[in-house]
């Protein structure tokens, strides 16, 4: 006879893990606009420079660039939400959340040492989120299809999902924010099908949830988080090839997916290319060395 109470506890633990991993995929860097419009509007802008800084782990420089963008575009919610992304990304780096093996190995992830979050950073992060949401909702009141506003709300929810799951370990709250971010991302894709960066919001989530056991996939699907392992990889590949701000991050997530799929060669190819593109990011050489030493 099945011990239903024990089964419920086991499935609850798996769902909590899925909540955390799903939050990770919403990630930190998500200004999605049409690729050709981005090239015309923001090439070499402070916003571009800021995200390059984040990929190079230059958080101080990135924050200066984001602040400069916000000063010149005070009504644009992308400014404050990018600042929030920079703050959270720096905290993740300090806490060790950005290590790829945590995605690959649940035991390593859940067994990592706990570090106290920075309360001052937390307050600044929430203030930037609140400011971005206020600006975004004001723009959506004027134009329900405003792409920058939809992006800002998507990223606000995604960042809060990440903080709740990975720092506060509030997994149910993280699932709530994850669903909000996915819904905003889908709405953006409806009005802008070639906003390729938006595919990352759902791509890694579909891949991770598609890798879970059937009962967990079923429960999460009821909660609005679909599972499609191969479709998720396809979405990531499109963002990696045709995205703008998120193309490098899609390559990072693809390399993680390849590690999980035991495709070491393709994972190393992506990580080596990322290391060449962002030489100041110490994560890439560490992960390259780890993969090479494992075989």
Briefly describe each language-model feature range.
Residues 37-46, 53-66, 75, 86-145, ...:
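Short coil/linker segments at helix-helix boundaries
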Residues 8-21:
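Bacterial N-terminal signal peptides that target proteins for export
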Residues 31-35:
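Sec/Tat signal peptide C-region and signal peptidase I cleavage site
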Residues 3-4:
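Intrinsic-disorder-associated, low-complexity terminal segments enriched in Asp/Asn/His/Tyr and depleted
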Residues 19-30:
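Bacterial N-terminal signal peptides
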Residues 256-295:
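A cross-kingdom marker for long, charged
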Residues 82:
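N-terminal carbohydrate-binding/catalytic regions of secreted carbohydrate-active enzymes
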């Amino acid at each position: 006879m099945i011990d239903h109470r024990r089964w419920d506890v086991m499935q609850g633990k798996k769902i909590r893990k899925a909540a955390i991993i799903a939050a990770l995929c919403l990630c930190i860097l998500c200004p999605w606009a049409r690729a050709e419009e981005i090239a015309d509007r923001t090439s070499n802008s402070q916003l571009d420079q800021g995200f390059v800084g984040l990929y190079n782990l230059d958080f101080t420089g990135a924050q200066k660039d984001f602040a400069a963008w916000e000063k010149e575009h005070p009504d644009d919610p992308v400014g404050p939400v990018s600042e929030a992304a920079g703050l959270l990304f720096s905290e993740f780096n300090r806490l060790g959340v950005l290590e790829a093996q945590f995605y690959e190995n649940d035991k390593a992830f859940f067994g990592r040492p706990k570090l106290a979050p920075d309360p001052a950073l937390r307050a600044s992060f929430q203030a930037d989120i609140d400011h971005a949401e206020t600006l975004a909702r004001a723009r959506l009141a004027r134009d329900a299809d405003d792409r920058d506003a939809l992006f800002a709300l998507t990223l606000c929810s995604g960042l809060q999902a990440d903080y709740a799951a990975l720092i506060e370990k509030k997994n149910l709250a993280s699932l709530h924010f994850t669903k909000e971010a996915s819904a905003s991302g889908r709405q953006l894709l409806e009005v802008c099908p070639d906003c390729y960066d938006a595919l990352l919001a759902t791509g890694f989530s579909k891949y991770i949830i598609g890798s879970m056991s059937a009962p967990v996939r079923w429960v999460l699907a009821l909660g609005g988080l679909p599972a499609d392992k191969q479709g998720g990889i396809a979405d990531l590949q499109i963002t990696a090839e045709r995205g703008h701000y998120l193309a490098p991050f899609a390559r990072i997530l693809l390399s993680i997916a390849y590690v999980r799929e035991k495709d070491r060669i393709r994972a190393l190819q992506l990580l080596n290319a990322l290391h060449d593109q962002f030489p100041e990011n110490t994560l890439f050489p560490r992960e390259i060395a780890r993969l090479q030493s494992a075989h």
